[in-house]
Amino acid sequence: MMTRVRRLQRPCRPFRPFGPLLLCAASTLSVASAAAYPTMAPFARYAISDRAAEIALARSAAPPSISDHARVLVLGKRGYETAAKGNNGFVCLVARSWDQGIDNPEFWNPKIRSPECFNAAGARSVLPRYLERTRWVLAGKTMAEMRARTKRLAPEPGSVCYMMSRHGYLNDAVGSWYAHVMFFGPDMEPAQWGANLPGSPVMADSAAYSPTTIFMVVVQKWSDGTRNRSM
C-alpha cells in the first residue's frame, strides 16, 4: 500500500537507474566518488559467492506474495543467469553499479547491491537494457563503446519495478534509501502527474531518460513487513 508522504523532503535527487534501473542518485556525489571508483574492480568484488544468498536478496525487492513466484536472475561471469523459474511474469534480480548512468561517479562501485523486481511489462521493455549493459561490462567494452551502443526506447505501458528491500545498497550516500515502487511511462512533463511538487508523494525524472519518464513513490513498509523510516 502506497503512502502519502507528508512533506517530501528528498535526501537526494530522483534515482537514475539506467543511466534506467532505477533509482536515487544523491546530490552529494561528486568528483571524489569518481576518483574512488575510476575503473572496474575484479569481477569477484561484484559477485555474490553464495547463490542462495543472492536469490534471497533478489526476492527481498518485493513482498513474498510477488517475489516467491517470480523468476530470479543471478550474476554470472558473462551476464545474468536464471537461478529460479517463476510463474507470475515477474523477474527479480540484484542489480550492480552499472545499473546507474554511464556518467554516474559510482558506475564501478563494487559495493552496490540493488534488489529489484519487475512486472511482466517491465521485464520485457525496461530490464533488457540493464541485462545488455551487463554483458557489455563483463565483455570489457569501454565507456565510449557502451555510450555509443545505448539505445533509449520507450517502455511498455504498465511497466513497474519494486524496490522494497531494506538490505539493498544503492550508493555510498544513501545506502538502502527508502522502500519504493517505480513506474515507467512515456516522455512527459512530471508536473502533469503532480510529481516533484511541494507536498506530493511522487518523484519523477524525465529529462535524463527521454523518451522515458520514471515515477517513484515511497511506500509504508519494507518487503519484510517492517515499517519504512520516515522521510
Short names for language-model regions:
Residues 29-38:
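Bacterial Sec-dependent signal peptides at the C-terminal "C-region" and cleavage site
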Residues 37-231:
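Primary mode marks residue(s) on the alpha4-beta5-alpha5 output face of response regulator receiver
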Residues 1-15:
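N-terminal secretory signal peptides that target proteins for export/translocation
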Residues 19-30:
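Bacterial N-terminal signal peptides
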Residues 6, 32-33, 94:
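N-terminal non-cleavable signal-anchor helices
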Residues 7-10, 19, 87, 112:
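Disulfide-bonded cysteine motifs in exported proteins
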